[in-house]
Amino acid sequence: LQFLDLIQEGNIGLMKAVDKFEYRRGYKFSTYATWWIRQAITRSIADQARTIRIPVHMIETINKLNRISRQMLQEMGREPTPEELAERMLMPEDKIRKVLKIAKEPISMETPIGDDEDSHLGDFIEDTTLELPLDSATSESLRSATHDVLAGLTAREXKVLRMRFGIDMNTDHTLEEVGKQFDVTRERIRQIEAKALRKLRHPSRSEVLRSFLDD
């Protein structure tokens, strides 16, 4: 897969995150979006470089596990543990761990990387101090698309969302903390946040993300 293809897959995942994110739950958008982006890129690589054939019944189980994982991620604001997944799916924890292991399919170290396909995936993971292409593509697509989307908001709306969801910051901020920054009440910040998120969901605002679906 070419690097730009990975970027495109990551942005498709980001668009899904924007569409499905429920801000009222109070969790960081960056955490939720990163999960979707990583899943989209990983799935794309696996589709192009599968080395082990998974039985149909196991694929169905993996799909169910992924679906429930997304639900629990939205509910808890973090990825669920195998123990939590086992409880929700009414399955033994050891079976959950087995499914998770199978889902992480081995990727051939000979998988071509780059426009000229003269490099291979193995070339990029020999030095563990370097960032993997997958992580690099995830980070770049999230930064780029998020910047473009927020640029369509007013300066105040964009700053409120950046502070609330920890975008380009070390941590997110509470309604009270953001309110102090703007010298307004927490309720006013809640209103600004809600209005900004409604704008992001409008087709005219999400065009920058939807364009990545066009061939």
From Swiss-Prot:
It is found in: Cytoplasm. It comes from the Bacteria. The keyword Transcription applies. Residues 175-194 bind DNA. One of its GO terms (molecular function) is DNA binding. GO terms for cellular component: cytoplasm. CDD domains: Sigma70_r4. A motif (Interaction with polymerase core subunit RpoC) lies at residues 5-8. Keywords: Cytoplasm, DNA-binding, Sigma factor, Transcription, Transcription regulation. Gene3D superfamilies: RNA Polymerase Primary Sigma Factor, Winged helix-like DNA-binding domain superfamily/Winged helix DNA-binding domain. SUPFAM superfamilies: Sigma2 domain of RNA polymerase sigma factors (SSF88946), Sigma3 and sigma4 domains of RNA polymerase sigma factors (SSF88659). Residues 149-202 are annotated as: Sigma-70 factor domain-4. Interacts transiently with the RNA polymerase catalytic core. Sigma factors are initiation factors that promote the attachment of RNA polymerase to specific initiation sites and are then released. This sigma factor is the primary sigma factor during exponential growth. NCBIfam families: RpoD_Cterm, sigma70-ECF. This is RNA polymerase sigma factor RpoD. It comes from Serratia marcescens.
